[in-house]
Amino acid sequence: MIETPLITKVPKSTKPYTKVLFKPDYNRFGIQGLTADMLGLLKKRVFDIAAVTDHSIKKVKIGFNEQLSPVKNFQNYVDLYVGNKSETKRIYESSDERWEYAIALAPNHEFTQVSFVNGICTFKGGKHVDYIMNQITRKLCDYIEKKKKVKVTPTSIKEQLMLFLRC
């Protein structure tokens, strides 16, 4: 259901802003209300949006249920998954405003990726994930072979890593 926008007058001293509210039509969806799982998914998506929004252009405030998101940039988003930098070591790189990634050791020794292309979550990965991971694993294989004189496969390295990627 789309309602008529509510436009209110504010004092001239108030900075201009746009506030977008989401109110699901429970009847249309055939549900009585939002479950805890649904709320969790919506909250995750709000954090996703906060992570991929370019906060340098404008001071954007993103919130959920009247509470501002703690995520102010992509690095904050990575912290939600693996803890802060002092708890979990990671490598972070931002080559330009279009590519940004972080690598950390996977806690469960299974490759995991969290990636976005143009602000859209690509939970199944894709060519962008392969592109970055192939470069990382190839360089690590070369480094380990040169420094430690041990031959390892890219797959054995990949399964130990967690990749966060925004492009």
What is each PLM-predicted segment?
Residues 59-159, 163-167:
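GHKL/Bergerat-fold ATPase module in large chromosome/replication-associated machines
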